[in-house]
Amino acid sequence: MVLLHHVSLSHYQNSSSLFSSSSESILCLFLVLCVMQLEQGMRPISRCYNPTAYSTTMGRSFFAGAATSSKLFSRGFSVTKPKSKTESKEVAAKKHSDAERRRRLRINSQFATLRTILPNLVKQDKASVLGETVRYFNELKKMVQDIPTTPSLEDNLRLDHCNNNRDLARVVFSCSDREGLMSEVAESMKAVKAKAVRAEIMTVGGRTKCALFVQGVNGNEGLVKLKKSLKLVVNGKSSSEAKNNNNGGSLLIQQQ
């Protein structure tokens, strides 16, 4: 009985050693198989990377980019260096000088225009031109305010001097509209050696209203002669009658 037990124990130990050696063999075989699979799955680097082809592609891209840049430069694109503070100040000063020069030219041109428009300008300096411009503007403004907007229904005639100017008179009259009216007015002024420098005429419903600015009146005596000459025209007399009456009026004044 003891002998059988000993045999069984020794057989068990042999089986255990055999099992352990088999396990190690299987493990080694598994590792070998894994390594073989890894070697089969890996490819040489040369298959994935071709240095010659890569360098050629990069070279083409580089030269193509350079050609594009040269085209941009040839079309007007340029790279400029940032300007220094001194250069920036010089550029700003030049721009300011050019703008100031243009402004002075524009002002001088406007003064030259005013010198040709103002009727009673004596001095040509800028201060005198500005003063005369203000005075003449106020004079014209007052003239416009005194002119009626519509012709009167009654014949009337009004004359006065313009702002103490003894040579310039303002004449405003209303009368019935008729053919040749303004020609008769011109002949009446010519008879007393006066000349209209500005005229504003309005005709509404068969009535005419006229505002004249007349030069050559020569004081109160000339104003009286002009009023007598124009009054005959406003009242509807013919130009010949107006001329004859005006001559008679002149003789009457001389006799007085």
Swiss-Prot record:
Gene Ontology cellular-component annotations: nucleus
Keyword Membrane: no
Residue ranges of domain bHLH in the record: 91-140
UniProt key word Metal-binding: no
Compartments, record wording: Nucleus
Residues forming coiled coils: none
Alphabetical list of InterPro entries matching this protein: AIG1-like, bHLH_dom, HLH_DNA-bd_sf
MF GO annotations: DNA binding; DNA-binding transcription factor activity; protein dimerization activity
SUPFAM superfamilies in alphabetical order: HLH, helix-loop-helix DNA-binding domain
Entry's transmembrane regions: none
Keyword terms, alphabetized: DNA-binding, Nucleus, Transcription, Transcription regulation
Subunit structure comment from the entry: Homodimer.
Name of the molecule in the record: Transcription factor bHLH131
Native source organism of the sequence: Arabidopsis thaliana (Mouse-ear cress)
Gene name for this UniProt entry: BHLH131
